[in-house]
Every structure is written in C-alpha cells, then in structure tokens.
C-alpha cells in the first residue's frame, strides 16, 4: 500500500462517523466501533434496555459514561493532526477544485491526471457558493426524511404498546378465567366432599349400631363358652340342665344375628361421563350473567307488536301505527333490543319454542335497516335462523346460508358475545345445565353492536308464535 493510500485510510479510521471530525476523546464500546465520547453521549438512550445507549452503527447497547477514553488512539489523532490539512494526501497539493461527479474536494493533479480525469470539475470556491445555495434545500430534504422516520418510529412505538397491551389483557383474561375455573372446581370439590362425608357418616353410624349388637352377642357367646367348660365335669342332672340352656341360647343368637350383608355407599363415580358433566356445569357457571334485555319498539317494523313489558314480540296481520324513526326496520319483520354493547362479555337467551321460522344474533351500528337485508358478516350481520321448523342455518359470507346439524328442536337459544375473544356463539340452551354449541362466528368487533331479532312473516298464522327474551324471576337468580 502506498503512503498516500495509507494516509487516506488513517484519516477514515480516525474520523468519527457522527460528527465527521477527527476523534475527540475517543471511546470504544464492547461492539468495537469508536466515536467521540461527546457524540456517543448525545445519542438518545434506549427506553427498553435499562437506559443504555445503542451503538449508532450496530445498535448494540452501551453506556458511554462508563467507558474509558482510548488514550492511545487519542495520541494517534494528535499525531495525525500534524499532517498538513487542506492538502491532497496522495499528491500533497492544495485541495483547490471539486469533482461534481464524485462529489469530492480534490487537487489539480487528481483532476488532470488522476482518477477524476475527464469528470466535470469546478473550482472549490464555485462549489462552495453552489452548495451553500443548495444548503437550505438539503436541510428541507433532511428534515422531511427525519420527520418521516420519526412518524415511522412513533407508529412502531404504538404497535409495541398495542402488542404489550394485548398480551397484558390476554394474560389478565387467562388469569381471570382460570381463577374462575379454580373457584368453581373448589366449590364442586367442597360440595362433593360434603356429600362424601354425609355418606361416610350414615354408613359409619349403621355399622357402629350393628357392631354394638354383635359385641353384645359376642359377650354372651364367651360367657356360654365358660359355662360349657364348667359343666364338663359335673353330674348328669346338672350337666344336662346347663347344656340345654346353653344350646337354646346359642340357637337364639344364631337366629337373631345373620351374617352382615355388604353395605353400599352411594358416591358419584369419577368416570369420563362424570368429568364431562362437571365440565358442562362449569362451562355454564363461567358464562357471563344473563342480560336482562327488552325489545326496542322504536326499531320494530310496522307489523310487529311488542308487549308492554318489552319481553315478547310477534308479527300481526295488520300494520301498526308507528312513528317514522331512522333506526326502524321498514321492510323486514325485525327489531333490536334497547340494550347495546361496545366491549366486554355478554350472554342472553331467547325463547323460540315451536316457532317454525325465525332468526337472531347481533348487528353492527352501521348495518342497513332499510329495504331488503343482506344478512352477512361483511354487511354487519352475525345471525343464525330456522325455517320450516327443522332447517337451521348460519348466515355466512357464502351465497347460500350454511346448514347446521342440530339435534332435536331447540326451544331456547343462548347468544354469547365476547369483544376480547372476537366471537359470537349460539347455543341450544333448552337445558340450562347442558348448553349445546350450534355455531360460532369469529370476528374482530369494533363499534357498537345490537342484539338482533327477526320475527319473520306470520304466514297466515302458521308463524304467529312470538319471540320472547328469557329472564327468570328475581327469586330464581
């Protein structure tokens, strides 16, 4: 390597990549990159790594305030400063011209004979004036780039916060749900324990009574054994008298004390069926409290009649006198409840009994209520329904509703909504201790949601049965 190349390499190695000046108080973090101590101290600290400073080159964490100044490198910088500045390190001529193609300050020899030969060359003073005029524009470009990166960093910071918040809420929900399960299982364990204790007490009491009787007979038998030993050497008359008495008593004891039978203790069998029953009961117990909802008559289509208490709705054969409300359904025989939701978990039940045609679920605040309804999730409808009293359907994005396999004929439908889990599930809740899942929609819900009910046309009385919101009396809660 020639001396000029060596000098150029030294200048590059002794230059701070932050201030583009020769090192001042150089420090070297563990990653091996070197900067001025003041420059590295001015770099913003990490917010998530105990306040460490990232290396501007490789992002490795460092603490510039704890780093020692590299004295050997500092002395080398001082020695390099003795080299004449403002001169070409290759030809040692003044840096008097500027190469516009390579954007580099060079000497006359570089321009006429060196690697810049044939390039567009201007004097250093011309370049200074020209670039001075361009400086404001360059500053604007730099500022725009900085602002763009700041926005990107802000977006990433928000995304990091959202991820942390999502995970935190997930952990909290897991803890809440598992604590609820543990609580229910503890209650179940205590209940089964009491049942077992009661069975044990009854069985033990019966056994102790029988044991007391057997103990009394045992005492008599031992006494008779002693009598028989005594009569063995007695005279004929006395022997016969006592022997007959003992024999009679023995026969009586044997007749009065049959051998003990097997005592059965009535305890639950811990089988797979038992575990399944416990799971079903626990699942029902962990559901949110039943919502006490009422139908909103101001949203009911004009053929619908809502009961005075707001718990029942049916389709009449004549139009009702209703006000013109923007939220009222005008064509379909539908309505929503007065209650609506924007967060949390919710559960409600609707009595359908033997009504042959109906639909229910949830709709978004922005779902269209005028004209023909296009009941799909993309249009803000998450519903299931029944037609002909036997065909159950989920209104998905497919061209035709998805037919559901349903055992029997549900008399009551439960609807479970969870904003955090992004689900709305439908259950056959005819048996409150045995909810049967019918269908689940998965959706990332946003905005306000309304419980939705489609009573359907009365069909000349064939479908005149009402839909009823189920809510038990206070004494049954």
UniProtKB/Swiss-Prot annotation:
What is one GO cellular-component annotation here? sarcolemma
Source organism, top-level taxon: Eukaryota
Supply the Gene3D superfamilies for this chain: 2.60.120.920, Classic Zinc Finger, Zinc/RING finger domain, C3HC4 (zinc finger)
- Quote the subcellular location field of this record: Cell membrane, Sarcolemma; Cytoplasmic vesicle membrane
Binding, Zn(2+) 2: 29, 31, 53, 56
Question: What are the UniProt keywords, alphabetically?
Answer: Cell membrane, Coiled coil, Cytoplasmic vesicle, Disulfide bond, Exocytosis, Membrane, Metal-binding, Transferase, Transport, Ubl conjugation pathway, Zinc, Zinc-finger
Provide the GO biological process annotations: exocytosis; innate immune response; muscle organ development; muscle system process; plasma membrane repair; proteasome-mediated ubiquitin-dependent protein catabolic process; protein homooligomerization
Look up the coiled coil feature and give its residue ranges. Answer: 135-232
Task: Say if the entry is tagged with keyword Metal-binding.
Answer: yes
Please state how the activity of this protein is regulated: Specifically binds phosphatidylserine. The binding to phospholipids enhances ubiquitination activity.
**ZnF segments: RING-type:** 16-59
The B30.2/SPRY domain covers which part of the protein? Answer: 272-476
Which positions does UniProt annotate for Zn(2+) 1 binding? 14, 17, 34, 37
Q: Which PROSITE patterns match?
A: B302_SPRY, ZF_BBOX, ZF_RING_1, ZF_RING_2
Q: Which GO terms describe its molecular function?
A: phosphatidylserine binding; ubiquitin protein ligase activity; zinc ion binding
Query: EC number(s) in its UniProt entry?
Result: 2.3.2.27
Task: Please state the residue ranges covered by B box-type zinc fingers.
Answer: 83-124
State where Zn(2+) 3 binds: 86, 89, 105, 108
Q: In which pathway does it act?
A: Protein modification; protein ubiquitination
Query: What InterPro entries would the database entry show?
Result: B30.2/SPRY, B30.2/SPRY_sf, Butyrophylin_SPRY, ConA-like_dom_sf, PRY, SPRY_dom, TRIM/RBCC, Znf-RING_euk
Q: What is known of its domains?
A: The RING domain is flexible in both the dimer and oligomer. Binding to the negatively charged phosphatidylserine lipids is mediated by the positively charged PRYSPRY domains and is inhibited by Ca(2+).
Q: Which family does it belong to?
A: Belongs to the TRIM/RBCC family.
* PANTHER family according to UniProt: E3 UBIQUITIN-PROTEIN LIGASE TRIM
What this chain does, per the entry, is described as: Muscle-specific E3 ubiquitin-protein ligase that plays a central role in cell membrane repair by nucleating the assembly of the repair machinery at injury sites. Acts as a sensor of oxidation: upon membrane damage, entry of extracellular oxidative environment results in disulfide bond formation and homooligomerization at the injury site. This oligomerization acts as a nucleation site for recruitment of TRIM72-containing vesicles to the injury site, leading to membrane patch formation. Probably acts upstream of the Ca(2+)-dependent membrane resealing process.
Recorded protein name is: Tripartite motif-containing protein 72
Organismal lineage: Eukaryota, Metazoa, Chordata, Craniata, Vertebrata
């Amino acid at each position: 390597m020639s001396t000029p190349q060596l000098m150029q390499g030294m200048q590059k190695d002794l230059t701070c990549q932050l201030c583009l000046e020769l090192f001042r108080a150089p420090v070297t973090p563990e990653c091996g990159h070197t900067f001025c101590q003041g420059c590295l101290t001015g770099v913003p600290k990490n917010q998530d790594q105990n306040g460490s400073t990232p290396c501007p080159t490789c992002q490795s964490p460092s603490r510039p305030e704890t780093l020692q100044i590299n004295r050997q490198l500092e002395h080398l910088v001082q020695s390099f400063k003795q080299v004449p500045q403002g001169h070409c390190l290759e030809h040692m001529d003044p840096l008097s011209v500027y190469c516009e193609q390579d954007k580099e300050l060079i000497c006359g020899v570089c321009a006429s004979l060196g690697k810049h030969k044939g390039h567009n060359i201007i004097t250093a003073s011309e370049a200074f004036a020209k670039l001075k005029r361009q400086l404001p524009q360059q500053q604007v470009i730099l500022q725009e780039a900085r602002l763009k990166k700041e926005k990107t960093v802000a977006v990433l910071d928000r995304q990091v916060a959202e991820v942390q918040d999502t995970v935190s809420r997930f952990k909290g929900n897991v803890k809440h749900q598992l604590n609820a399960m543990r609580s229910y299982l503890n209650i179940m364990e205590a209940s089964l324990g009491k049942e077992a204790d009661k069975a044990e007490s009854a069985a033990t009491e019966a056994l102790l009574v029988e044991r007391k009787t057997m103990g009394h007979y045992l005492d008599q038998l031992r006494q008779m054994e002693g009598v028989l030993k005594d009569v063995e050497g007695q005279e004929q008359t006395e022997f016969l008298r006592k022997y007959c008495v003992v024999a009679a008593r023995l026969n009586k004891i044997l007749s009065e004390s049959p051998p003990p039978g097997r005592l059965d203790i009535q305890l639950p069998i811990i089988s797979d069926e038992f575990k399944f029953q416990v799971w079903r009961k626990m699942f029902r117990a962990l559901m949110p409290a039943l919502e006490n909802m009422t139908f909103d008559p101001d949203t009911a289509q004009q053929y619908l009649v809502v009961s005075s208490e707001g718990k029942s709705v049916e389709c009449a054969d004549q139009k009702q006198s209703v006000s013109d409300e923007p939220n009222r359904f005008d064509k379909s025989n539908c309505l929503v409840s007065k209650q609506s939701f924007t967060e949390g978990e919710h559960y409600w039940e609707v009595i359908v009994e033997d009504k042959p045609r109906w639909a229910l679920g949830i709709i978004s605040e922005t779902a269209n209520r005028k004209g023909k309804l296009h009941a799909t999730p993309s249009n803000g409808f998450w519903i299931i329904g029944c037609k002909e009293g036997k065909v159950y359907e989920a209104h998905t994005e497919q061209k035709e509703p998805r037919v559901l396999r349903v055992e029997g004929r549900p008399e009551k439908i439960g609807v479970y909504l969870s904003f955090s889990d992004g689900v709305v599930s439908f259950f056959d809740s005819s048996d409150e201790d045995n909810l049967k899942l019918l269908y689940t929609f998965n959706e990332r819900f946003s905005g306000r949601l309304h419980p939705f009910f489609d009573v359907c046309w009365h069909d000349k009385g064939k479908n005149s049965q009402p839909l009823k919101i189920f809510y038990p009396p206070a004494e049954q809660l």
